[in-house]
């Protein structure tokens, strides 16, 4: 191999190494800003294809329906505890702040926050469904895939 080819090979290797390093650093920097979307069932059992569970402390968005009878408000503050469900599971959420006007039991919501211990989400933002015709695309897809409710929603409360 002549000297000119060796120099070109070294330059090509250096460019590829620099490109790989740049991509790695960009992905590492963006990792803290990416909020992955999960349903309650995916938090409990993992994503469908990979069965990967979210980690404690991970920022995420959770979409589902507010469980009827689960909304508990603290009388001394703006703290609210409620549960979000889908066909595969239920996740508890804590939020401190003013809830959207359209927030109510049985309605679709998307909460953004951090996953805590025991699959508890500490929400920093709560988004309620806008009107009866609008559903966020991620929530609509997830609800179509599992359009059943957990059995606890159907239990007769009188007995």
Curated annotation (Swiss-Prot):
Region described as Disordered: 130-159
InterPro entries, per database record: CcmE (IPR004329), CcmE-like_sf (IPR036127), NA-bd_OB-fold (IPR012340)
Cytoplasmic side: 1-8
Compartment list: Cell inner membrane
Binding site for heme: 130, 134
Periplasmic side: 30-159
GO cellular component, one term: plasma membrane
Gene Ontology MF annotations: heme binding; metal ion binding
Role description: Heme chaperone required for the biogenesis of c-type cytochromes. Transiently binds heme delivered by CcmC and transfers the heme to apo-cytochromes in a process facilitated by CcmF and CcmH.
Protein name: Cytochrome c-type biogenesis protein CcmE
């Amino acid at each position: 191999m002549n000297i000119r080819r060796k120099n070109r090979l070294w330059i090509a290797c250096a460019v590829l190494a620099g490109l790989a390093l740049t991509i790695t650093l960009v992905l590492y920097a963006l990792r803290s800003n990416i909020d992955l979307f999960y349903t309650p069932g995916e938090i409990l059992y993992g994503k469908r294809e990979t069965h990967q569970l979210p980690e404690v402390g991970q920022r995420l968005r959770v979409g589902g329906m507010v469980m009827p009878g689960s909304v508990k408000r603290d009388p001394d503050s703006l703290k609210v505890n409620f549960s979000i469900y889908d066909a595969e599971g239920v996740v508890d959420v804590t939020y401190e702040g003013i809830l959207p006007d359209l927030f109510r039991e049985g309605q679709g919501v998307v909460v953004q926050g951090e996953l805590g211990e025991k699959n508890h989400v500490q929400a920093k933002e709560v988004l309620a469904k806008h009107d009866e015709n609008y559903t966020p695309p991620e929530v609509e897809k997830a609800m179509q895939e599992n359009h059943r409710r957990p059995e606890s929603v159907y239990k007769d409360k009188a007995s």
